[in-house]
């Protein structure tokens, strides 16, 4: 059974299913019991894999593109769960066939996996020391293909800057479990050829951010 909260309810279970509750309960338990980020993420992998392997828990509208999204390119970013204190979120990211995300970071540990379709991920390593908030020297460090049911970890600063392209015939849907309120925190968008960095907040397609007009924090 799947229940929805009103999209104006910014926090908690925006989509409430046993599968999502099972993952969030396990994540919160491990956040209390394990202090090391890498150990916590490793311990979370079975529960995350279980969610990726389950059918029927993701509503159709949260697996569809969004032509008005803050990510651009028809990319939909749909909140499924958000902790009120900003410590955890679960969301789906829908990328149309052939479309790519901007090159961006996440600023949080977590897990990302493909629920539907197939993606190519290009990961960057930052070569400069970050002293200039408007500039970045990036080099490609890895290129991966991620298929349905496969996932990878995020443990910033390692491998935190990337972009993703859908390489399947239809839109891809990835599921993100991250230790912040990802779409509502100020992150960074990169242009490697120009060497520039821009603060951005992608926003959710189905839930509002608090303090929409707040200036970005560098």
How does the language model describe each region?
Residues 1-56:
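N-terminal leader/capping segments at the start of a protein or of a new domain
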Residues 69-97:
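A short glycine-rich, His/Asp/Glu-containing loop-to-beta-strand
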Residues 91-105, 155-159:
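Conserved short histidine dyad/triad with adjacent acidic residue
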Residues 108-127:
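Glycine- and acidic-residue-biased ligand/ion/polar-headgroup-sensing regions
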Residues 111-113, 169-184:
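A short hydrophobic beta-strand segment most commonly corresponding to one strand
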Residues 126-161, 203:
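Short acidic-glycine-tyrosine-enriched beta hairpin
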Residues 156-175:
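Ligand-binding loop in jelly-roll beta-barrel domains
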Residues 190-218:
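Long hydrophobic alpha-helical segments typical of transmembrane helices together
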């Amino acid at each position: 059974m799947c229940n929805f909260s009103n999209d104006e309810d910014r926090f908690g279970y925006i989509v409430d299913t046993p599968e999502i509750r099972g993952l969030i309960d396990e994540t919160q338990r491990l956040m209390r019991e394990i202090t090391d980020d890498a150990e916590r993420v490793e311990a979370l992998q079975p529960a995350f894999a279980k969610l990726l392997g389950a059918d029927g828990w993701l509503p159709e509208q949260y697996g569809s593109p969004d032509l008005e999204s803050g990510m651009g390119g028809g990319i939909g970013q749909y909140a499924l769960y958000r902790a009120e204190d900003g410590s955890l979120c679960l969301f789906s990211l829908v990328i149309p066939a052939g479309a790519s995300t901007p090159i961006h970071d996440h600023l949080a540990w977590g897990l990302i996996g493909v629920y539907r379709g197939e993606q190519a991920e290009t990961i960057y390593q930052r070569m400069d020391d970050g002293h200039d908030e408007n500039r970045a020297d990036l080099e490609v460090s890895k290129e991966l293909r991620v298929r349905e049911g496969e996932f990878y970890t995020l443990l910033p600063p390692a491998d935190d800057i990337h972009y993703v392209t859908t390489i399947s015939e239809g839109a891809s849907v990835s599921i993100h479990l991250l230790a912040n309120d990802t779409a509502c925190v100020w992150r960074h968008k990169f242009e490697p050829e120009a060497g520039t960095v821009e603060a951005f907040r992608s926003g959710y397609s189905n839930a509002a951010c608090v303090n929409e007009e707040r200036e970005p924090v560098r």
